[in-house]
C-alpha cells in the first residue's frame, strides 16, 4: 500500500494489511500499537521522531533518524503489516538518499512475557548521489529513565558493566574484530519495565549518550537520556549502498538480565545485512 497524506475524512482509516494482532492498527502514514497502558506510534513523514512510546505522563521516543528538516524530502513509503518503510532525500551538500524500515514484534521479544513486551527494529540504508560525500547518520533514542546499565555480548558470553549510570556523558567506539553487540538497558520510571537498545559492532561507527535531570518528569529520580548511535563512514562514494540496524526491546525489569542476554545473543548470530 502506497503512503498518502491523510485528509480529515480518512484519519481513522485502517489499511488492508493490518497485522494479525488486534493491538496493531495501521493507516496510510504509519501505525499505532498498544500494550496495556503503553501506546507506540510511528509517522513516516516524521522520521526524526521514530517510534513514540507513551504511557500516562511519560513519553519516550526510539529509533528516530537524525535528518536535517530544512533539506529533507519524503519521497515515498508504504505499510505492510507490522513493517513501515520510508524513502527520504536530503537536498543539501551531502545529497544522501536514505531509507528506514521500522519493524514491530520481531524475533527479539522476551518469550516469557510477550503480552507485556515490545520489540522494534530499524534497518537504515543510505547512499549518495555525489562522487564522494559525508555518509554519517545518527539514530536517536530519547528516554526518561532512572538509570542505565551497559553490557556487551562477545565470543558467546554477555558482560555487564558493574556500575549503573545516572547523570553522564558517555562515548564508545566500535573496535572489536569479531561481531560484538552492545546493550544499553534503561530502567523506566512509573512502571517496572526496562527498555534495552542493541547495536552490532560491524554495523555501527560509534555511540554517544548524555543525560540531564528530567525536570518535566513526575518521577523525582528520573533523568532524560539521549542516546545517539552513528552509522556509516564519514566518506562514502556514489553507487555504494551502506546499511545498518538497531534493535530496541521493552520487557519486564525482573527478568531483564535473561532477555537482554538472549536478545544480544540472537542479534549477534544474525548474518550481515550486506555480504
What are these regions (language model features)?
Residues 1-10:
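Intrinsically disordered, low-structural-confidence terminal and linker regions
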Residues 12-21:
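Preference for solvent-exposed, low-hydrophobicity sequence contexts
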Residues 25, 29, 36-38, 47, ...:
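Extended, loop-rich substrate-binding clefts of extracytoplasmic carbohydrate-active enzymes
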Residues 104-106, 118-122, 227, 244:
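Hydrophobic residues positioned within well-ordered beta-strands of beta-sheet architectures
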Residues 108, 124-130, 141-147, 233-235, ...:
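Beta-strand elements of well-folded, non-transmembrane domains
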Residues 113-167:
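Acidic (Asp/Glu-rich), glycine- and aromatic
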Residues 156-190:
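Low-complexity, serine/threonine/proline-enriched polar segments
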Residues 180-275:
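Beta-strand-rich recognition/accessory modules
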Amino acid at each position: 500500500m502506497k503512503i498518502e497524506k491523510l485528509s480529515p475524512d480518512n484519519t481513522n482509516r485502517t489499511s488492508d494489511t493490518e497485522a494479525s494482532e488486534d493491538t496493531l492498527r495501521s493507516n496510510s502514514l504509519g501505525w499505532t500499537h498498544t500494550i496495556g497502558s503503553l501506546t507506540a506510534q510511528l509517522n513516516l513523514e516524521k522520521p526524526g521522531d521514530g517510534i513514540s512510546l507513551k504511557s500516562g505522563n511519560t513519553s519516550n521516543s526510539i529509533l528516530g533518524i537524525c535528518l536535517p528538516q530544512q533539506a529533507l524530502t519524503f519521497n515515498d513509503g508504504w505499510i505492510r503489516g507490522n513493517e513501515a518503510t520510508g524513502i527520504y532525500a536530503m537536498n543539501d551538500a551531502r545529497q544522501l538518499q536514505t531509507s528506514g524500515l521500522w519493524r514491530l514484534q520481531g524475533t527479539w521479544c522476551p518469550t516469557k512475557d510477550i503480552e507485556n513486551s515490545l520489540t522494534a527494529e530499524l534497518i537504515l540504508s543510505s547512499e549518495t548521489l555525489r562522487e564522494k560525500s559525508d555518509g554519517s547518520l545518527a539514530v536517536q533514542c530519547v528516554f526518561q529513565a532512572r538509570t542505565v546499565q551497559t553490557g556487551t555480548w562477545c565470543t558467546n558470553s554477555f558482560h555487564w558493566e558493574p556500575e549503573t549510570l545516572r547523570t553522564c556523558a558517555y562515548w564508545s567506539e566500535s573496535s572489536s574484530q569479531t561481531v560484538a553487540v552492545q546493550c544499553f538497558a534503561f530502567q523506566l520510571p512509573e512502571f517496572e519495565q526496562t527498555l534495552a537498545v542493541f547495536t552490532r559492532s560491524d554495523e555501527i561507527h560509534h555511540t554517544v549518550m548524555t543525560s540531564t535531570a528530567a525536570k518535566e518528569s513526575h518521577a523525582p529520580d528520573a533523568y532524560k537520556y539521549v542516546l545517539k548511535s552513528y552509522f556509516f563512514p564519514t566518506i562514502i562514494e556514489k553507487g555504494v549502498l551502506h546499511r545498518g540496524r538497531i534493535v530496541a526491546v521493552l520487557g519486564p525489569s525482573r527478568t531483564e538480565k535473561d532477555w537482554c542476554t538472549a536478545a544480544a545473543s540472537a542479534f549477534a548470530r544474525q548474518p550481515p545485512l550486506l555480504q
